[in-house]
Amino acid sequence: MKEASYTKKRCRLGRLLFGLILLWFIAGCGYHVVGGGEDNIAPGIQSVFVDSFINKTSEAGLESLFRNAFIDQVLRGGRFQLAGRREEADAIIRGNIKSMNTSHLSYQATDLAAEERLSVVMEVTFEERVSKKVIWQDRNFSYNGDYPVTSGSLTATQVERKDALTKLSNDVAERAYSLMLSGF
């Protein structure tokens, strides 16, 4: 009886020891998430100016839509003050909208589009104003947004597309801002 109790205690001790060694190994293996949020941005960068975006597409007004989305994101993010003029800023966000495409995503039984996808490709740069040092940049930042096509109503489809463009610009700004802060 004593031998069975001794074996159980030894087995428990072995499991505990194995668990502690495993925990120690995992904690000490150097595994960690890359990019630490705001720590990637120099503390001296407190104000940001969102420069006018360049629009190389045939879609009128995209530059204003995306610039406004980035301005809203800087205000929502809370990490930076929004500078009213370039000269007042520590850093600048610039954007260059390279392309905007619309493609059919799904079809109705009558072979008409039921849903369409907007795809944008743009260059986004976050740089120090004075030194022009690039803090973060993605030359081919791409994002998609979907919207339903209302059969028989061009006006309803246009409203859906406009709403999808607004959502797409906000999603792009949010994602790019997050990547800027994390250093990815």
What are these regions (language model features)?
Residues R94, L168-D171, R175:
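Residues within well-formed alpha-helices
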Residues F18, D39, G84, D111-A113:
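Residues embedded in well-ordered secondary-structure elements
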Residues A27-D72, R76-E87, V130, A173-E174, ...:
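A structural "domain/chain start" motif
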Residues L16-G28:
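Bacterial N-terminal signal peptides
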Residues K2-F18:
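Bacterial N-terminal signal peptides that target proteins for export
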Residues A4, V34-G37, G44, V48, ...:
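Surface-exposed loop/turn and secondary-structure junction residues enriched for glycine/proline
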Residues K56-N68, A113, R117, Q158-D171:
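Soluble non-cytosolic domains of exported or imported proteins
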Residues G77-G78, E88-E160:
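Surface-exposed short loop/turn segments
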